[in-house]
């Protein structure tokens, strides 16, 4: 069996790992073993956080909608309940965008939601329309 010398492949592999680890702090950008370990962690963090980003954006949209809804004397919960009852199908991303860019349209949506809400005794006193 022929002897396999791996110097070219090994150098190529190490060079690619060190190139990918540019910008890391300290030894993690200079030493191959540390750089390889950090790169594995970095790729895991990237994979995990790409999924976590979706939930973070949803939280951001909900807090923006809630702030705009409370400015219109209704809670987020009652607003969403009213929009569902009225058959208004607008997702949270677009609703948050409307709340920021077009407050008049958001107020109109709040009025639609209020009209569709049932009058019940469990609603807070300031929200009964």
Swiss-Prot record:
SUPFAM superfamilies: Ribosomal protein L20. Residues 1-17 have a biased composition (Basic residues). GO terms for cellular component: ribonucleoprotein complex; ribosome. Keywords: Ribonucleoprotein, Ribosomal protein, RNA-binding, rRNA-binding. GO terms for molecular function: rRNA binding; structural constituent of ribosome. Residues 1-29 are annotated as: Disordered. InterPro entries: Ribosomal_bL20 (IPR005813), RIBOSOMAL_L20_CS (IPR049946), Ribosomal_protein_bL20_C (IPR035566). One of its GO terms (biological process) is ribosomal large subunit assembly. Belongs to the bacterial ribosomal protein bL20 family. Binds directly to 23S ribosomal RNA and is necessary for the in vitro assembly process of the 50S ribosomal subunit. It is not involved in the protein synthesizing functions of that subunit. This is Large ribosomal subunit protein bL20. The gene is rplT.
């Amino acid at each position: 069996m022929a002897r396999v010398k791996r110097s070219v492949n090994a150098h190529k592999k190490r060079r690619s790992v060190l190139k990918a680890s540019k910008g890391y702090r300290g030894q993690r950008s200079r030493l191959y073993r540390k750089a390889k370990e950090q790169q594995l962690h970095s790729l895991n963090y990237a994979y995990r956080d790409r999924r976590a980003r979706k939930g973070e954006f949803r939280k951001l949209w909900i807090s923006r909608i809630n702030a705009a809804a409370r400015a219109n004397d209704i809670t987020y919960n009652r607003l969403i309940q009213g929009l569902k009852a009225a058959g208004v199908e607008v997702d949270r991303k677009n609703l948050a965008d409307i709340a920021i860019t077009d407050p008049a349209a958001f107020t109109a949506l709040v009025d639609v939601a209020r009209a569709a809400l049932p009058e019940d005794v469990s609603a807070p006193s300031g929200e009964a329309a």
